[in-house]
Amino acid sequence: MAIEMLGLILAGGQGTRLGKLTKDVAKPAVPFGGRYRIIDFALSNCANSNVKNVGVITQYQPLTLNAHIGNGAPWGLNGINSGVTILQPYSSQEGSKWFEGTSHAVYQNISYIDQQNPEYVLILSGDHIYKMDYEAMLESHKEREASLTVSVMEVPLEEASRFGIMNTDDNDRIIEFEEKPKEPKSNLASMGIYIFNWKRLREVLVNGYSKGNPMEDFGGDVIPAYIEAGENVFAYRFKGYWKDVGTIDSLHQSSMEFLDLNNELNITDKSWRIYSHNDISAPQFITEKSNVKNALVGDGCYVDGTVLHSILSQNVHVQEGTVIEDSFIMSGTFIGENVTIKNAIIGENAKIGDNVEIIGENEVAVIGHGEIKGENKNEQ
């Protein structure tokens, strides 16, 4: 049975710039916002945009990510006419098939895509924080009779070299594209979100690999090839909140922005919910002696200290005399007495002993998942 549009989320990235936080966890599975993982935003956008069939392409350290996604039930992707499929590298008679790039990952999963039989494929990155209506982007794609539509946004010119940068004509047709240029000519950046006509993309990928001209990356190979061939390639301008949380600084900054009641993500918006898989925990307990201001405190937390402008994920234990400020504490972490944590990210299931100081002065301080720092006498 044919479907109109298949979603493909590229979720195999290692995220080396996140250091300790991705040592054993794929970047899209890194926690965010107290109750989410980064990939929840792409999955929830699919659910809210009526994209009912989604393939998640994984590679690096996929166990936590796979367990989190499960059968897709939190996002409504477990119905009769909907579903989520985890797509991992595999071996065949031709040998191993590790993904060499973004478009190579799609090429290696052609059989799955053909099985879904879509008219269009929506390519997404699994490591960005944003809300977006993909149906509106698809309507723009169809109205312009595009072969490829690239979602774009304006970024500060000094940051443009981190992105694929393009120039457009007056009708937003893309006439020039350069992946991460050293000297960018514009500040119109690719968001790593694409809609392709599947038959044409399939033809381009198969021809490239069969003729010894492999198309391994969308930004470096496929998009420039489309433009050079005179294909109808258009930009779709996005003006909402979008953050690439690929560095410690950007993850911390986005987490702190999450605490702003006026932030553009508006996580309380019932018309565009962000869904996630969460364990059932007891209610949070805030003691009489505690001081909690401008903070998100997850279920199962016990707080007997001071928490200021910070996020505590589920089941975080904060003992008496401890001060946490401008920090993101991930789930399951135990923090002892008289601890000072400022400008920091603490990984899941970490243990922080009594009288420890973790202060990010010139850069964000990071404690990895399961890391132990100091000793505490009252650990529960």
Swiss-Prot record:
Disulfide bonds: none annotated. GO terms for molecular function: ATP binding; glucose-1-phosphate adenylyltransferase activity. It comes from Lactococcus lactis subsp. lactis (strain IL1403) (Streptococcus lactis). Its EC number is 2.7.7.27. The lineage of its organism: Bacteria, Bacillati, Bacillota, Bacilli, Lactobacillales. The gene is glgC. Keywords: ATP-binding, Carbohydrate metabolism, Glycogen biosynthesis, Glycogen metabolism, Nucleotide-binding, Nucleotidyltransferase, Transferase. Belongs to the bacterial/plant glucose-1-phosphate adenylyltransferase family. GO terms for biological process: glycogen biosynthetic process. PROSITE patterns: ADP_GLC_PYROPHOSPH_1, ADP_GLC_PYROPHOSPH_2, ADP_GLC_PYROPHOSPH_3. The keyword Ligase does not apply. It catalyses: alpha-D-glucose 1-phosphate + ATP + H(+) = ADP-alpha-D-glucose + diphosphate. This is Glucose-1-phosphate adenylyltransferase. Involved in the biosynthesis of ADP-glucose, a building block required for the elongation reactions to produce glycogen. Catalyzes the reaction between ATP and alpha-D-glucose 1-phosphate (G1P) to produce pyrophosphate and ADP-Glc. It is an enzyme of class 2 (transferase). Pathway: Glycan biosynthesis; glycogen biosynthesis. Homotetramer.
